[in-house]
Amino acid sequence: MMKYLKYYIVPLLSTSVFIGIYLGGHWMWLGLVVLFLVVVGGDAVLGEDDSQPEYSYPWLLEIPLHLALPIIILLLLSFAWASGSAGEDFLGIGQLLSGLFSYDFLTARDRNMWFDYLGALFGVGFVVAGVGTNVGHELTHRIKDRIAMLEGRWLLSASCNADFAIEHVYGHHVTIGTIEDPATARKGENVYIFYIRSTVMGHISAWKLELKRLRKKGNHLLSFNNRMITGYMMSALWCGLFFIAGGIFGLILFLGQAAIAKLILEVVNYMEHYGLSRKPEQPVGPEHSWNSTKTMSTLVLFSLTRHSAHHETPRVKFWKLDPYKDAPQMPYGYLTTLIICLIPPLWYKIINPSLNEWEQKNLPA
């Protein structure tokens, strides 16, 4: 049973961000601290996991995926409430909770300082990236499942990622490793330059792909058939909700966490394919993605870490992915590697020996 229950750590981790938001003050850093301790510490203590267990009840693995959207909705509603000024109680949440627990949630919130909100901003941003964007990624690969696609797009709306479900599935998975792929980092490319290039060019690519689809179907550009426009509208609803709850400050908080979540997504893109090049005519293989078999990273990211297998067989559900122990390996777990990427000289020093070895093996002399 533990092989099923272990994936429910994601909803449990998310509760620490909720608790921090409602307790207020320095507690608003709780979620971020817990996340780093559990994920980085878990990877260090638990080591590697290259197992491929058989699952007789796969529906038990689907539940945490479908819990993601309720978690993100409740999290953003909570964060919107936290943005309210003194005397404001968005949706009556503070009064409701104060009636259930012996704690004055409204007074605690009204005492929050800018430093406290900063902690919540990063905590929410990491959950929106790790739960929202990551699960949205898993679900929007299920292109024939309308419910999964709708869930995935709403999850991506929390980070203003209207383009991702289009460009990632129909662009990145086709052009991975080539010069045409915005989401493949080139050798020696600074992560911050990559962030700008991938964000801008990925968005343009999504528009091109969507326009091509609309023309093929005979649909008008300015219609609800345009997934870019409906994606913008989804995120606009979140913007409106935060503005109602907290005015300009609320809107800043929403856009701030979305920017953090987007940065995390692009850094993950950066480290998953850094320097691994491919000719357009060459088939996509396990050698074109950096893998990780770290246990905790694998659990909290629903096997996104088995990225080589994901690109080789993108329609395969997360629990069926091969660990590919012989594929290029990240030096550490995902969260640790992400932080290292933010320090380019350190990243180059750590990754370049492995990349040079990969080039000798995979590139023609």
Place the predicted regions along the sequence by residue.
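Cytosolic/stromal cytosol-facing helical appendages immediately following the last transmembrane segment
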Residues: 2-14, 144-228, 249, 254, ...
